[in-house]
């Protein structure tokens, strides 16, 4: 377990979320933009780039390793509690996915959300805000 204070306190964090680890769109399109641009994003003053999905921590760790995402903090929102608290749930029950997260990205400065993009939330769209 990791607390939100551990992630956000005293830091500038770019947190992005995807509906699910290992899903085609997230794996082929969304995550790679952040992996490729991690150095550029950090050069603009971001301390931590975090990727979150409503998956368990083990799945997120395996997905991060499979995608060479060593520069990213891979976070599992196992029960979707954080996602629900943000009001950014996606109902994927019709596709057999259960409750998931919408695709979004936010900039958080010392625990305060300064920008929130919900589709589009690509690395390019977030870099334009830095």
Language-model region placement:
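Chalcogenol-based redox active-site neighborhoods
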Residues: 1-130
């Amino acid at each position: 377990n990791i607390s939100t204070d551990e992630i956000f306190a005293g830091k500038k964090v770019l947190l992005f979320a995807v509906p699910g680890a290992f899903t085609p769109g997230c794996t082929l399109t969304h995550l790679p933009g952040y992996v490729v641009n991690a150095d550029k994003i950090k050069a603009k003053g971001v301390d931590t780039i975090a990727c979150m999905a409503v998956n368990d921590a083990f799945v997120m760790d395996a997905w991060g390793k499979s995608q060479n995402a060593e520069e990213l903090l891979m976070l599992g929102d196992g029960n979707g509690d954080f996602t629900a608290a943000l009001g950014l749930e996606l109902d994927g029950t019709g596709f057999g996915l259960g409750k998931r997260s919408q695709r979004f990205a936010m900039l958080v400065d010392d625990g305060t959300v300064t920008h929130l993009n919900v589709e589009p939330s690509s690395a390019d769209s977030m870099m334009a805000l830095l």
